[in-house]
Every structure is written in structure tokens, then in C-alpha cells.
């Protein structure tokens, strides 16, 4: 069970390792989109995340860079929604963000962590959970719930490979996000990349100078392979 949860958590971080693919992208009766409502970190967090990402790439050049196709972000909610209702989803999320005003918050990053998928691991910068973050997530869940559907197919995700790069575990993760990654299980973080477990253990053993930052905005993304924020659907105005 623990190993299963670790693999599922790795998908949530933004990059899974060694997972089964779902063949083909079967059509659904009504188009569905897999979305990630995310906070965009400010320059302070982005600089820290990119610096850490560069360290990981020096150790493991086959990893991924934080760039236009791997946006540094803090996932608040991942769901399947009806594509025809996307504008309603954007409006509902915007209303919540306008009320909460997350760009006025100060958040604290306090450690690295990684999810093992031996011999590799997916690393992130962990953000201290706050009542504000929990409240925002709760409100987003309520606001988007009328437009959600239980599950989706690979066609719901951004793919340049006809859906063949979409993992079955990823579909399950998005389907069960509220149960498995919200509330007491919410672990706010910014993914920084992938490296060997040996390197990550050494990295985590070093002191982590905590720092503060603020959200600079928010967006709705279409999820891609391994849960990456691949395509911005709407920039929100918190």
C-alpha cells in the first residue's frame, strides 16, 4: 500500500516514473478536460526552484527543465470537468480567488522532499500549509464541483502523442484528487525536478534556508503526461 501511495504521490508532484501507459485515447460521450487550478509563485520562489532544478540537471541531465512546458506552480485542485463548462469553471475559480486575495499572503518554504521511485526520485520545495491555503482549496472544490465528472480518458489531457503518453495512474490520481490530496492530505509544494535517490538523499541532508514568498497570480492548466501543467487554459485574476 505504501509503495502504491508513493507512486500516486509522484504523479501529483508533476512527474511520475516507470508507470503503465493507457493505450489510445478513447472518445467520451461528452468532451472532458483534465485541469489543474494552480497558484503561480512569485520571482523569489521561481528563482529558488530554478536554482534547485539546475542542481538536479547537473546530477541527472535526462531530467526536465522548469520552462514553458513545465510551469513552476502550486497545485490547488486537479479535476475532470466538462469541456463545455470551462468558462463556468474559470468564472467560479476567479470568484473564489477574488474573495480570498492570495497575492496578499506570505507563504513559507521550509524544506526539500522527494518521492522515491527507485532508483530515482521526484523532488519538490515544500510549503508550510496554512489556514489560508486550506480554505482556498476547500472553496475551490465547492465552486468547481457542479462542473466536474467522475473520470476521463487520455483524450482529456494535453498530449502530442495521441494520448499514448497518458498514464492510467494519472487518470486515477485526478479522479481521486479530493479524497487523496486535499484536506489533511494536502501537501503544497513546487516541483523542482528529478534525480537519483542517492543525490536527493545527499541534497536533503544539507541545511535548507527557509524563505518566504507570495503567490503572484493563478491559472487553470490542462494537465499533461505525469501530471505536468502543460497548457495554460486561462490566467486568473486573484
What are these regions (language model features)?
Residues 8-20:
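Bacterial N-terminal signal peptides
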Amino acid at each position: 500500500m505504501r509503495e502504491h501511495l508513493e507512486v500516486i504521490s509522484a504523479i501529483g508532484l508533476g512527474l511520475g516514473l516507470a508507470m503503465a501507459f493507457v493505450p489510445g485515447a478513447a472518445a467520451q460521450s461528452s468532451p472532458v478536460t483534465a485541469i489543474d487550478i494552480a497558484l503561480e509563485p512569485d520571482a523569489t520562489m521561481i528563482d529558488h526552484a530554478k536554482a534547485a532544478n539546475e542542481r538536479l540537471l547537473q546530477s541527472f541531465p535526462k531530467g526536465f527543465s522548469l520552462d514553458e512546458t513545465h510551469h513552476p506552480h502550486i497545485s490547488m485542485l486537479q479535476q475532470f470537468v466538462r469541456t463545455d463548462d470551462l468558462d463556468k469553471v474559470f468564472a467560479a475559480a476567479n470568484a473564489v480567488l477574488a474573495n480570498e486575495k492570495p497575492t496578499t499572503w506570505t507563504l513559507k518554504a521550509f524544506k526539500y522532499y522527494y518521492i522515491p521511485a527507485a532508483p530515482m526520485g521526484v523532488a519538490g520545495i515544500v510549503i508550510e500549509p496554512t489556514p489560508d491555503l486550506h480554505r482556498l482549496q476547500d472553496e475551490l472544490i465547492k465552486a468547481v464541483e457542479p462542473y466536474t465528472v467522475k473520470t476521463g480518458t487520455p483524450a482529456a489531457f494535453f498530449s502530442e502523442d495521441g494520448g499514448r503518453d497518458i498514464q492510467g495512474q494519472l487518470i486515477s490520481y485526478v479522479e481521486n484528487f479530493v479524497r487523496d490530496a486535499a484536506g489533511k492530505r494536502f501537501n503544497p509544494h513546487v516541483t523542482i525536478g528529478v534525480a537519483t535517490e542517492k543525490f536527493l538523499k545527499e541534497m536533503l541532508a544539507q541545511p535548507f534556508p527557509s524563505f518566504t514568498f507570495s503567490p503572484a497570480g493563478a491559472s487553470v492548466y490542462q494537465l499533461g503526461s505525469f501530471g505536468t501543467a502543460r497548457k495554460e487554459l486561462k490566467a486568473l485574476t486573484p
